[in-house]
Swiss-Prot record:
This is Transcription antitermination protein NusB. GO terms for cellular component: cytosol. Keywords: RNA-binding, Transcription, Transcription antitermination, Transcription regulation. Disulfide bonds: none annotated. The gene is nusB. SUPFAM superfamilies: NusB-like. HAMAP family: NusB (MF_00073).
């Protein structure tokens, strides 16, 4: 426990529990979906996430930060995905499938320097998110695309997050 220097009684302060990465990914996916449906709705997104996902304002804002970074890199992410997908186009995938691909690709590229997430973890999370938010029939294409991309070194992002944003 730590104490706050500004408190006269020096009352102990409990550190908040770290926000689980699985929950963060779900929030980011929901935010990406909402913004693809309503691109002008970012102003109300934090309160929407707080209400619908029952999370704190801090955690909703944290998820929105990732959402913004993914959207800032979307042209590069989509170009890589379009170059990898062979049997269809990115535009023909569902909104959820596109955003799962973007999010996992972003996380893979983002964390290469500071704390790389093992590919097996990203694949397992992709599978979990597809089962929870999409149709399992689409999982083989999504997993094949990510597997193909993860086999090669990740290109650098134009708009990275803070170096330790996804770490810990």
């Amino acid at each position: 426990m730590s104490v706050m220097a500004s408190d006269k009684a020096c009352a102990p302060v409990r550190a908040s529990r770290p926000f689980p990465k699985q929950k963060l990914r779900e929030l980011v996916l929901q935010a990406l979906y909402a913004l693809e449906i309503d691109p002008e709705g970012e102003d109300s997104l934090v309160s929407l996430l707080m209400t619908e996902a029952s999370v704190s304002k801090k955690n909703a804002a944290y998820a929105l930060m990732f959402c913004r970074a993914i959207r800032a890199n979307q042209p590069d992410l989509d170009a890589l995905l379009d170059a990898t997908i062979r049997t269809t186009t990115l535009a023909r995938l569902t909104i959820i499938e596109r955003n799962i691909l973007r999010m996992m690709l972003f996380e893979h590229q983002q964390n290469q320097d500071c704390c790389p997430v093992p590919v097996a973890v990203l694949i397992a999370e992709t599978t979990r998110l597809i089962k929870k938010f999409s149709y399992s029939e689409g999982s083989s294409l999504i997993l094949a695309v990510l597997g193909s991309i993860f086999d090669h070194p990740a290109p650098a992002l134009d708009t990275p997050l803070e170096p330790t944003s996804m770490c810990g």
